[in-house]
Amino acid sequence: MTKRVKLEARSGFEMQAEVAEPAGDARAPGVVLVQEWWGVNDHVKDLTTRLAGEGFLVIAPDLYDGKTTKDPAEAGALMQALDTARAVDQIAGAVAWLKASPRCSGKVGVTGFCMGGAMSFAAACHVPGLSDRKSVV
């Protein structure tokens, strides 16, 4: 199960994300899970929870500020309207949030699917402090 958290993007504006923690109290590697073009929907929340079940501290930054859709045309419009620099800023904020968490081991990676895969590539180029970068496109 995920919980909604508020945090700051790298540049300081407030943003939100879904977080799932692994069982127990041990420190765990962190994963930034970047959404698909549908938004941070139930599927992304489920993936966040499943990754936590595998022992990761997971955060899924909400790049659409709460908007989700099931309609491909609307998803395309949301993706086209996405400001890539702002999204990378949000991913950087998620990385910083993980690194500041007492549950995080200090290792942080980023992964994503579809649009999230492309954003993971952008983050790999522009977000310092990542331990690993994986994309599924």
What are these regions (language model features)?
Residues 2, 14-17, 110-111, 125, ...:
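Catalytic beta-strand/loop cores that center a nucleophilic Ser/Cys/Thr
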Residues 102-114:
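Alpha/beta-hydrolase fold nucleophile elbow
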Residues 4-103:
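Serine-hydrolase catalytic machinery in alpha/beta-hydrolase-like enzymes
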Residues 117-128, 133:
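Short glycine-enriched nucleophile-adjacent loop
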